[in-house]
C-alpha cells in the first residue's frame, strides 16, 4: 500500500507547512487612505523576511510597517502622499514619481499594500507615464516591463539588505534555521532515493532519473522537474551554450 508523498502533504496545508506569520510584528504593507508626515521609530528584523523592516509612526498616531530603504535610519522623517518629494524613504503614487526613479514595494493594484520588488537589494524602475490612461510603466527586477495603475503607491529607493545571497550558509545548521523561519521542509530527500511506495521516482536496483510528469498532471501527482526545458547531464552544458 502506498503512502501520501511529500507534495500531497504540503498541498493539504498542515501547520508544519504554513508560514509562521504569528512570529512577526505585523504585515508589511501600506495602510489605506494615509498621507502626511511620519517618523521611523524602529528598524526590525522579522523572522522569515529577507530584508529589514521599518516601523513608521504617522502624525495622527497610525503605525505601519514598510521595508527599510537603503540608507534609512531611526528618527528619519518621511512623507507619504502625492505632495511628498521623491526622496529616499518617501511613499508616493506612481503617477507622481519622475521617470528613471528607483522604487520598491510597488502596488500591483491600488490599495493592495505592495506586491513587487520587496526582496533585499532589489528595486523596480519607473520608465514611463501614460497620464491619459492613468497608467505607469514599470520595469521589474526580473526585467519584465508592466503597466500598473498610476494611483498605486511605491517607496523611493532600494530595499536594504542587498548582498544577502552572496554570503554562503557555510553550515547546515544555518540552513535549518532559515528553513524553519519560513516553514520549508528541510532537509529534503531526493525522490529517486526513496522506496517505490513513497515516491513515483523511487525503487529499482540502482538509482536512475525519473520521467518528468506532464504539465497537465493534477496536483499531488506533479513531482521532480515540472515543465523543465531539459534534463540529464547535458542540461547545464546546453544552457551555457544558449547563453553564448
From Swiss-Prot:
One of its GO terms (cellular component) is cytosolic large ribosomal subunit. It holds the Pfam family Ribosomal_L2_C. GO terms for biological process: cytoplasmic translation. InterPro entries: NA-bd_OB-fold, Rib_uL2_dom2, Ribosomal_uL2, Ribosomal_uL2_arc_euk, Ribosomal_uL2_C, Ribosomal_uL2_dom3, Ribosomal_uL2_RNA-bd_dom, Translation_prot_SH3-like_sf. Keywords: Ribonucleoprotein, Ribosomal protein, RNA-binding, rRNA-binding. GO terms for molecular function: rRNA binding; structural constituent of ribosome. Residues 1-12 have a biased composition (Basic residues). Residues 1-26, 193-225 are annotated as: Disordered. The keyword Cell inner membrane does not apply. SMART domains: Ribosomal_L2 (SM01383), Ribosomal_L2_C (SM01382). SUPFAM superfamilies: Nucleic acid-binding proteins (SSF50249), Translation proteins SH3-like domain (SSF50104). The keyword GTP-binding does not apply. One of the primary rRNA binding proteins. Required for association of the 30S and 50S subunits to form the 70S ribosome, for tRNA binding and peptide bond formation. It has been suggested to have peptidyltransferase activity; this is somewhat controversial. Makes several contacts with the 16S rRNA in the 70S ribosome. Belongs to the universal ribosomal protein uL2 family. Part of the 50S ribosomal subunit. Forms a bridge to the 30S subunit in the 70S ribosome. PANTHER family: LARGE RIBOSOMAL SUBUNIT PROTEIN UL2, RIBOSOMAL PROTEIN L2. This is Large ribosomal subunit protein uL2. It comes from Pyrobaculum calidifontis (strain DSM 21063 / JCM 11548 / VA1). The gene is rpl2.
Amino acid at each position: 500500500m502506498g503512502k501520501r508523498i511529500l507534495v500531497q502533504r504540503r498541498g493539504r496545508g498542515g501547520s508544519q507547512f504554513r508560514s509562521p506569520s504569528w512570529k512577526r510584528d505585523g504585515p508589511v504593507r501600506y495602510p489605506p487612505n494615509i498621507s502626511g508626515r511620519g517618523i521611523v521609530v524602529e528598524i526590525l528584523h522579522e523572522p522569515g523576511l529577507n530584508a529589514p523592516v521599518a516601523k513608521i509612526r504617522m502624525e495622527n498616531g497610525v503605525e505601519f510597517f514598510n521595508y527599510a530603504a537603503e540608507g534609512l535610519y531611526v528618527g528619519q522623517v518621511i512623507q507619504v502622499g502625492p505632495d511628498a518629494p521623491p526622496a529616499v524613504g518617501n511613499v508616493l503614487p506612481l503617477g507622481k514619481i519622475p521617470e528613471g526613479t528607483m522604487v520598491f514595494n510597488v502596488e500591483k493594484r491600488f490599495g493592495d499594500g505592495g506586491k513587487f520588488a520587496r526582496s533585499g537589494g532589489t528595486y523596480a524602475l519607473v520608465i514611463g507615464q501614460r497620464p491619459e490612461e492613468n497608467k505607469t510603466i514599470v520595469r521589474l527586477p526580473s526585467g519584465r516591463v508592466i503597466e500598473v495603475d498610476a494611483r498605486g503607491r511605491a517607496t523611493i529607493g532600494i530595499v536594504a539588505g542587498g548582498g544577502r545571497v552572496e554570503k554562503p550558509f557555510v553550515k547546515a545548521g544555518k540552513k535549518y534555521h532559515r528553513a524553519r523561519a519560513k516553514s520549508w521542509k528541510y532537509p529534503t530527500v531526493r525522490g529517486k532515493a526513496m522506496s517505490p511506495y513513497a515516491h513515483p521516482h523511487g525503487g529499482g536496483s540502482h538509482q536512475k532519473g525519473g520521467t518528468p510528469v506532464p504539465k497537465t498532471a493534477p496536483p499531488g501527482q506533479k513531482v521532480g522537474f515540472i515543465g523543465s526545458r531539459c534534463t540529464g547531464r547535458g542540461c547545464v552544458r546546453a544552457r551555457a551554450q544558449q547563453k553564448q
